[in-house]
Amino acid sequence: MPTYAPKAGDTTRSWYVIDATDVVLGRLAVAAANLLRGKHKPTFAPNVDGGDFVIVINADKVAISGDKLQHKMVYRHSGYPGGLHKRTIGELMQRHPDRVVEKAILGMLPKNRLSRQIQRKLRVYAGPEHPHSAQQPVPYELKQVAQ
């Protein structure tokens, strides 16, 4: 019997909603990245995008352990001399908490031809509401140790 090789149209995609309230950022990112890639499915293949859609709500209430809010820096460069911009995670969490969560999740995805396609299935919202109720997302529970 030949080995089963999934094709792009063979997979059925579901929608999951993850509540980020009091969840450690790294553990949230790992769970979301696995859902986006489809590693929880028996038909997983690394060369086919078979993952599901993921909605992350309450990104402003995510837990960042240790003193990373004050000391972990995020860098960007404009491309011009002297164009290095740096901010702490705490400053970014005040302005754009959804971008901090999104950057953590996207950093755990592979950097290959499928990455853009996988990234389009991620939606992150700072508050508790999201506009995807028509897709009937299933709540995804993260198992974590109490903090």
Swiss-Prot record:
InterPro entries with a match to the protein in the record: Ribosomal_uL13 (IPR005822), Ribosomal_uL13_bac-type (IPR005823), Ribosomal_uL13_CS (IPR023563), Ribosomal_uL13_sf (IPR036899)
Segments of this protein annotated with the region Disordered: 128-147
Keywords: Ribonucleoprotein, Ribosomal protein
Any one Gene Ontology molecular-function term assigned to this protein's record: structural constituent of ribosome
UniProt keyword Repeat, yes or no: no
Gene Ontology CC, one term: cytosolic large ribosomal subunit
One Pfam family from the record: Ribosomal_L13
GO biological process entries: negative regulation of translation; translation
Description of how the protein assembles with itself and partners: Part of the 50S ribosomal subunit.
NCBIfam families: rplM_bact
Entry similarity comment: Belongs to the universal ribosomal protein uL13 family.
Protein function: This protein is one of the early assembly proteins of the 50S ribosomal subunit, although it is not seen to bind rRNA by itself. It is important during the early stages of 50S assembly.
Protein name according to UniProt: Large ribosomal subunit protein uL13
Organism: Mycobacterium tuberculosis (strain ATCC 25177 / H37Ra)
Taxonomic path: Bacteria, Bacillati, Actinomycetota, Actinomycetes, Mycobacteriales
